[in-house]
Regions:
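Extracellular polysaccharide-degrading/modifying enzymes targeting complex plant/algal/animal polysaccharides
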Residues: 1-106, 221-308, 313, 318-321, ...
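Residues within well-ordered beta-strands of beta-sheet-rich folds
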Residues: 9, 156-160, 199-201, 211-215, ...
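Surface-exposed loop and edge beta-strand positions of immunoglobulin-like domains
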Residues: 146-148, 203, 272-274, 307, ...
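A short, polar/charged loop-to-alpha-helix boundary motif
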Residues: 660
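Residue-level signal for short segments within beta-strands and strand-turn junctions
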Residues: 63, 173-175, 331, 409
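Extracytoplasmic
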Residues: 91, 101-222
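Glycine- and acidic/polar-rich repeat regions and solenoidal domains
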Residues: 269, 291-307, 323-376, 382-622
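Short beta-strand/loop motifs in extracellular/secreted proteins, especially
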Residues: 6, 57-59, 155, 165-170, ...
Length: 660
């Protein structure tokens, strides 16, 4: 009936729970209950997934609509102590264990490596982008950072690091033997060029200003380095030959009276084969799916997904609690799925090289109807609480429009690692429009556009509270346009691509730049026809009329392999090397800004001088000004190929015609 709420679930209500200890219950179900798919026997796996020394199952247990944490052992559910790790024979390798980019002691209280005044062992290294790292950190080394303000107390320690061997950071105040405030495990990772953040609550509260000492040690990584918070409730399952037993904590709730849901289905709405075109899914609540990891080299089932089809409309839905991906605009499956991590017998060893493998994925897509899929519309959905990504797609989302979605709390449990976690993660966003989305509290990134971002328009999005960056452009040749976005995380933009135009953005955090030797495809303009492969050099980037609220260094513009341009940008304070750009404005003092949530939405309070903003002329940005991307030789334009002109602001108000 009109106005009725319709909910589609991948879960079932389970009763028959038996109390086995204080606040611990169990239920045993015959395996026939699950049919051909038992999510408690199926582990999350796939290319570019790292399980972090334990298994992660596709099943889940829900109390009052929220999922419990999967424990790494039955002992953990009963809150028995973890087995002690035998370190009697452990000897440090002598290798560097990680390098540090910055510390964050409480929200927004950053300590930079430049602030280090004394150390034994590590070295300070200033990178091309003019940020300083602490490098060559080995077991037993230490570093001092003076006069750090703990104010009335800070609640967490967060570090940004490249992990090599892995180990621990002990934070002491007022001396190496002073009060131990935090011990942070900085785990291992398989991809050293990607920067990760690590966080731990403060073990002791201190106030006021103190000298901070970091002591570094190499150590074996414990079986489960990430645990749920103290209030987190856990579950654990064992699958035997004939039945499955689930133990869970319910926080004083009687599960037989309240009704407990458990995952039983791999998806909620997903076609059984490719090529099911022109489907509209509108106005549903869809949740609780036992999805698998959705990497770019495999079929990508989501809680709802299109599976290599054309012309879907997914709008006005509430989508939540997918074990991995919420909405997928993904590729078909074939014999080469996940071959980078799990090569089938007889496959070439070249598949172990991820770049080689994905280039072959693109080649196969071209002969499997890549030009006949995509053109989807994903709009006005509320997407939350998904383990991997809110919207995910490899190649199958070309020529699509993604607008007006609210995406938040993606990969927030962070029980595992990988390289596919974001609010929106697309490979091959060819001629896509991604606009007016609100994305926050997602790990690792808000929006991650990886490979084949060509003809893409990213416009009018609000992004904040992302640990690695609001937006990452990885190994693309462009052209792509990033315009009218508000990016407020500590790192706003990480540009690992050429051929980008950044226009009229409000940038609250840092800007990172990277280059790459990987050779990735270049396409014929406004098509999916591959014309060649090319590495990712520095440069061919345009920065017009942006407002930088934080420190940014423009010197690398003069050092790029390919020419880059900056003009008409406003720098909040402590900008560096603005002589490399035209018509730059540097404010006399840092702009004051605060993002706040209220009952009727999110609000940004920002104080800036209108006179300073109007003090220099700025150019109207258009296709004529932006020109063509060097490598793809494609004009900067709208996704449909029509000329681009930036004549309106984030709210849709017209720019001043003489000085935008």
């Amino acid at each position: 009936a009109p106005g009725e709420k319709v909910t589609l679930l991948g879960s079932e209500n389970i009763r028959g729970w038996q109390s086995v200890a204080s606040d611990i219950w169990k239920v045993t179900l015959p395996n026939t209950f699950f049919g051909d798919f038992n999510p408690y026997a199926e582990t999350i796996r796939g290319d570019w997934f790292t399980r972090v020394d334990r298994e992660h199952h596709r099943g889940a247990v829900y109390l009052e609509g929220e999922w419990l944490w999967e424990a790494h052992s039955l002992d953990a559910v009963f809150r028995r102590p973890d087995p002690v790790i035998d370190q009697t024979d452990f000897k440090p390798s002598g290798e560097p264990i990680f390098k540090l980019h910055y510390l964050e002691i409480g929200e927004g209280n950053f300590v930079r490596m430049d602030d280090c005044t004394a150390c034994e062992g590590p070295e300070l290294f200033k990178r091309e982008m003019r940020t300083t790292e602490l490098v060559n950190i080995r077991d037993g080394h230490w570093a001092k950072f003076p006069q750090v303000d703990f104010a009335a107390g800070r609640d967490f320690l967060r570090v940004c690091a490249n992990v090599l061997v892995g180990g621990y950071i002990d934070l002491h105040v007022d001396g190496l033997d002073g009060v131990a405030v935090a011990c942070l495990p900085v785990g291992t990772t398989e991809k050293r060029e990607i920067t990760s953040t690590f966080e731990v609550p403060m073990a002791e509260q201190v106030t006021g200003v103190h000298d901070v000492y970091l002591r570094f040690c190499e150590a074996p990584v414990p079986p489960c380095p990430i645990q749920p918070p103290a209030e987190g409730r856990m579950w654990f399952a064992e699958v035997a030959e004939h039945d499955t037993t689930i133990w869970a904590q319910f926080g004083g709730v009687d599960p037989n009276a309240d009704g407990i849901e458990i995952n039983v289905r791999p998806t909620v709405f997903y076609p059984s084969q490719p090529g099911i075109d022109y489907i509209t899914v509108r106005g549903f609540e869809m949740r609780n799916a036992a999805t698998n990891w959705a990497p770019p080299t495999a079929e990508q089932p989501g809680l709802i997904g299109t599976q290599w089809s054309r012309g879907w409309i997914i709008e006005n839905n509430v989508i939540s609690h997918s074990a991995c991906a919420g909405i997928t605009l993904g590729k078909y499956g074939d014999a080469f799925d996940n071959a980078t991590s799990y090569p089938a017998p007889g496959l070439s060893a070249d598949y172990l090289n991820g770049t080689w493998a994905f280039n072959r994925t693109v080649e196969r897509a071209a002969v499997n109807g890549w030009d006949r899929v995509g053109h989807h519309t994903v709009r006005n959905n509320h997407i939350m609480h998904c383990g991997q990504g809110g919207i995910v797609g490899s190649l199958g989302g070309v020529f699509s429009t993604i607008t007006g979605n609210h995406i938040h709390h993606i990969h927030y449990q962070r029980l595992y690692k990988g390289y596919e976690q974001a609010g929106i993660k697309l490979h091959g966003s060819v001629d896509c429009t991604i606009a007016h989305n609100h994305i926050h509290h997602c790990a690792l990134y808000g929006i991650w556009l990886d490979w084949l971002t060509q003809g893409t328009l990213l416009c009018g999005n609000l992004l904040h509270h992302h640990p690695d960056a609001d937006i990452l452009f990885e190994v693309n040749h462009g052209p792509f346009i990033c315009a009218n976005n508000i990016c407020l995380s500590s790192t706003a933009i990480h540009n690992w691509s050429s051929g980008g135009a950044f226009v009229h953005n409000l940038i609250g955090g840092r800007v990172r730049r990277s280059s790459d030797g990987r050779e990735t495809p270049v396409l014929k303009p406004h098509s999916v026809e591959v014309t060649g492969l090319h590495p990712i050099p520095n440069g061919d980037v345009r920065w017009y009329n942006n407002v930088f609220l934080s420190e940014v260094d423009m010197a690398p513009l003069n050092e790029h392999y390919l020419d880059s341009i900056a003009d008409g940008n406003v720098h909040g304070h402590t900008a560096h090397h603005t002589e490399h750009e035209g018509h730059a404005v540097v404010m006399d003092s840092p702009p004051q800004w605060h993002l706040r949530e209220a009952s009727d939405g999110w609000f940004l309070d920002l104080e800036m001088s209108p006179a300073a903003l109007a003090s220099v002329p700025r150019k109207a940005v258009s296709s004529a000004l932006l020109g063509r991307a060097v490598i793809s030789v494609q004009a900067f334009a709208q996704p449909d190929g029509t000329p681009f002109r930036m004549d309106r602001d984030y709210f849709g108000n017209a720019h001043e015609p003489g000085n935008p």
